[in-house]
UniProtKB/Swiss-Prot annotation:
It comes from Arabidopsis thaliana. InterPro entries: Glyco_transf_92. It is found in: Membrane. GO terms for molecular function: glycosyltransferase activity. This is Glycosyltransferase family 92 protein At1g27200. Keywords: Glycosyltransferase, Membrane, Transferase, Transmembrane, Transmembrane helix.
Length: 575
């Protein structure tokens, strides 16, 4: 064989070796790509056999397969969040509330609830929702435990391997009917909100029957102080010295009840926490200039109506907004963030406690006291209107702020009450595109009930309220406005698709839910409706006795664009 032929064969062999090496590299790259694609599908919940879909509430047994991939997902989640640690669980009638000892943010969709049966079998269901709770904690809502499964629910990320035995941590489940649920520092006292102490509505209780217990987290140390005031679901006690001296500490606060015979019962279970740093922050706020007029409200799924309400009342002079969100799932956080970006001073406070409107208002009165001279308590479907300003050609802008400012120096006036006019559907069958103030123009003839704007520092220490008004300190009274000066337009009976949501649950503590066959003559109910959300044939014509376009005319003349006619809250149409 010639040297030329030998050289040619060597070149062919070299080419084959290079080709084999190239194919091996391509094969390895292809394998890695397949691995990461599979990992993506697992994390995106694309393979139903490995995870549970978030839009399904059907039980699904968890099969612990592909442990290598699960370990990878574990590492991924550990990089994003600290280990999930369930601090407390509260059993509500229609869901379980899990309180986490750290933050995970609102709307985390990759969380699943893990249930364990009597034989240690596991069941995985998607979480209902998640949210921020306070500065340090988060909450997750889970479906109620199915039959034969424990309510001591655990929490994991979707795609993680279900552990047969969880790390040792609190397994307690609190009954919503008997638990301390919130606490807030007010000066040298703490206000504790608790279910299960008394069912006496609208009356103060003897504080000598109550004490507050303060327990330092992760410690056996406990301190007890005597109650100063008590009413409904509120107990106020003095702060212990240890909290004043340790502002960096966190305390669990619970309430002890002493019966009339002097026997002390164990402290009620509690998920309420306070932080020593809260008292320092409040002292710093107290030194600043207060807003003249603020508003507190509690709502559920009112995001579509919030913009009109805030823009209009801001024009009347409201400077600060406290929104207590009672389990909304309609994008309320995004709406508030948008309003804040437009320089409206709005904050959202997560309030997961059902049927506690009175307590929520008391809580807000304490929070707002350091920032506001006056605080209004009214709903998103209620709008202040000044008929005299309209009829006499007086400017209505800042009218509400000017009104309360006239009484700021009056130490004997702690509350300003305004009567309400209830409006009906006004012949409409769909939500008015220009908002409630323009769309609903027919009302009942006679006013019913009232709404209040209060001076927080002139309330009784018990913070007793009946939603529509608060109890004031001895010697302090209220001012009732005549209708010609101011009224509240209450768009109470809207088109049926909006109105029927009221059947879901009433927010006030002592108001019976409409599905229950009780107190059907109550003013809280709609006359002529039973216990089911069935639309009457003549609904659009009901509650219409007087056509009143006063507020509509005011809004159109002051808010409508002169060229397009659009109102500023018609954002979607303008886009």
């Amino acid at each position: 064989m010639t040297e030329y032929e030998n050289g040619k064969k060597r070149k062919v062999r070299n080419k084959q070796q290079v080709k084999v090496q190239f194919l091996s590299q391509r094969y390895l790259i292809l394998c890695f790509c397949c691995f990461f694609v599979l990992l993506f599908f697992l994390s995106s919940d694309r393979i139903s056999t490995l995870s549970v879909r978030s839009d399904s509430l059907r039980p699904s047994l968890r099969v612990p397969t592909l442990s290598v991939l699960s370990s990878s997902m574990d590492s991924f989640h550990r990089g994003r969040f600290p280990p999930l640690s369930v601090e407390d669980r509260v059993q509500f009638p229609d869901h379980l509330l899990l309180i986490l000892s750290h933050g995970i943010g609102k709307g985390e969709k990759n969380l699943v609830c893990v249930y364990r049966g009597v034989k240690e079998e596991t069941l995985v269901l998607p979480s209902i929702s998640s949210d921020e709770f306070d500065e340090f904690r988060s909450i997750v809502r889970c479906p109620n435990a199915p039959l034969n499964y424990s309510s001591s629910v655990d929490l994991q990320f979707r795609g993680d391997l279900v552990k047969k035995k969880m790390k040792k941590q609190s397994r307690r489940v609190h009954n919503w009917e008997k638990v301390g649920y919130e606490a807030v520092i007010d000066g040298d006292t703490v206000v504790v909100f608790v279910k299960g102490l008394t069912r006496r509505p609208h009356k103060e209780s003897d504080p000598s029957y109550y004490k507050c217990q303060f327990e330092i987290e992760n410690s056996e140390e406990k301190e007890v102080t005597q109650a100063i005031a008590a009413a409904q679901e509120v107990v106020r006690c003095g702060l212990p010295e240890s909290l004043k001296l340790n502002p960096e500490m966190m305390f669990r606060v619970s309430v002890i009840h002493i019966d009339p015979r002097g026997r002390t019962t164990p402290a009620l279970p509690s998920v309420a926490r306070i932080y020593g740093s809260d008292s320092i922050e409040k002292k710093e706020k107290k030194s600043g200039v207060k807003h003249e007029l603020c508003v507190c409200t509690m709502l559920w799924n009112q995001a579509p109506f919030l913009r009109e309400w805030i823009m209009y009342h801001s024009w009347l002079g409201v400077e600060r907004w406290f929104i207590y969100d009672n389990n909304s799932d309609d994008g309320i956080q995004e709406e508030i963030e948008l309003l804040s970006s437009e320089n409206y001073n709005v904050s959202r406070h997560v309030w997961p406690w059902i049927k506690t409107q009175e307590a929520g208002f008391s809580h807000c009165a304490v929070r707002a006291k350091e920032e506001c001279n006056w605080v209004g308590f009214f709903d998103v479907d209620e709008f202040y209107y000044f008929p005299t300003h309209r009829s006499q050609g007086l400017p209505s802008k800042n009218a509400l702020k000017s009104l309360v400012s006239n009484y700021t120096s009056w130490d004997l006036v702690g509350e300003i009450r305004t009567d309400c006019h209830s409006y009906g559907p006004s012949g409409l069958t769909s939500v008015p595109s220009q908002g409630v103030t323009v769309g609903y123009t027919c009302r009942q003839a006679n006013p019913e009930r009232h709404k209040s704007i209060i001076r927080p520092e002139l309330l009784t220490s018990s913070l007793l309220n009946e939603v529509h008004h608060f109890q004031l300190k001895e010697g302090v009274g209220h001012m009732s406005l005549v209708e010609s000066v101011a009224v509240v337009n209450h768009y109470k009976y809207q088109v049926w698709d909006t109105f029927k949501a009221k059947f879901y649950r009433r927010v006030a503590t002592y108001v019976v839910d409409w599905q229950e066959n009780q107190n059907q003559g109550s003013k809280d109910r709609a006359p002529g409706l039973g216990t089911e959300a069935i639309e009457p044939p003549d609904w659009k014509r009901r509650f219409c006795e007087v056509w009143d376009t006063g507020l509509k005319d005011l809004v159109m003349s002051n808010f409508a664009d002169q060229v397009t006619g659009y109102l500023p809250w018609q954002r979607q149409q303008q886009e």
